[in-house]
Amino acid sequence: MYRYFLKLEKHTLVMLEEELEFVSKYCDLLRERFGESFVTDIDIPDKYHGARIIPCTLQVMVENAVKHNVVNSSSALHISIGVGMRHIVVRNNLNPKKTEPEVSTGTGLQNISRQYEILFNRRVVTGKTASEFIVRIHLIL
């Protein structure tokens, strides 16, 4: 994973395929930490693997879900990553932490959103239902 970060220093965009490999490894680490309480479903058809994405976008989305939700044996966190209408769609069930939210460092969802607006004049769209949080990120084809 560290090699991926070092490689990113020179790149504004990476292939979606590389990003998916990275987020899969990151999710493997989280599964070691949380066990069966951390569930992921990554379903991106091969035809999208050549699209481009800002580095670490998916890792930030997963990290955001873990940061804001309870993950334990009585409350599993389910995260799905898929494609819909030229967007990557990241969804997670909601089970918000009851404690005060951590102070934002500006390196998470807000930072990714700013990068997409500045570089591509595209918005990262977020939404929430009673049961899930959804993020839509425009694919750079």
Regions found by a protein language model. Give the residues of each.
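Two-component histidine phosphotransfer core
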Residues: M1-H138
